[in-house]
Amino acid sequence: MIRITTNSSLRMYRSNLMKSTNSLNSAMTKLMTQRQFSSYASNPAAATRAFKIHSSLNATNAQYSNNDTVLHKYETAWSTLASVLDGYDGLVQDTGRVPALSGLNDTNLSTLNTQGQIIREGAEAIIQAMNGKYGNNFVFAGADSLNAPFAINDKGFVTYRGVEIDNPDTLDDIYLDDKGQPIKDANGKDMTNKEVLDMWNEEHQYVDIGLGFKLDGNGEVIPSTAFDSAISGIGIMGYGVDADGDPKNLASIMLRLADIFEGYDHETQTWNVGSRSEAEELLKKLDASREAMGEKWTTLDTEANFLDKNGTQLKNTYDALNVERSNLEDIDPADAILELVWAKTCYNAALQVGTNVIPQSLMDYMKSV
């Protein structure tokens, strides 16, 4: 016959009471925190998986934010080009082609000066539009989005980051930065203004939008794993001069047309700056430049559509990850309440058992304390 001593009964009771207390505390904590576990030790496997999911959620959220920012930037760029190029309502048509065609009409030669002023104002409006911003960043400034990219200097030339983009007399000059220092190329040679413009036109601003962002052995971004968010204004509008020495930039062509028109002397019927044939040729080049910009406009639209679809994919990925996280971490309120009720019942039962296990003298002592 096994004899159960009072001390043995007390030890068993204390152990069971502690288990009931812990179960009650655990059930109460679950209901208050709405979480399945509050520490790694509670459920190591689930906690490890949850940590990985949280990491993926944070990365996906950052990628979605990057994608959304770039998308709005591209939408702003698209809208800007629409105001410049769009059909019969764009700045090029209203303030470029129409006044140019009107001025070159023999019956309107007397209005050439006025038409020239309209064209000049149109070119200035285009430059202002191309200095548009999204948030605090200039849209068409390439990788240097904190400074306005375009201007028209005192000599009447369009500049990009301070460099005249189509002045034949300065394109081959050595470029000097704000401190008067040249920039060296890969071979240690001083770069010319044209070479610097080429460099700016090719610069990149890579952003992680969930394409598998990765660096190569030299710490450079692998292009296929990121999105290049840099939009070069000169890449869109053109820069440099053609074989005839005429500007390729759309606004510069308009400024040159304005110079020719404003230089016409109606009284003597002479072209003091350029000639009629030059103006007619520039008008053709204006159309060609607008067509080239239209192709870049289409490219922007294609890239904006890609960003829009990528944003939808990132959102779907985030939602799927969040569902998995919720299944691991979040409680079912009904189950949690039932668990709490059961734990409370067990705890009360354990207390009730104590009245039969603990000697009456000890119970009386505990009541008197």
Language-model segments: residues:
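Polar, low-complexity export/assembly segments characteristic of proteins
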Residues: 17, 28-31, 35, 127, ...
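Amphipathic alpha-helical polymerization modules
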Residues: 1-146, 262, 266-369
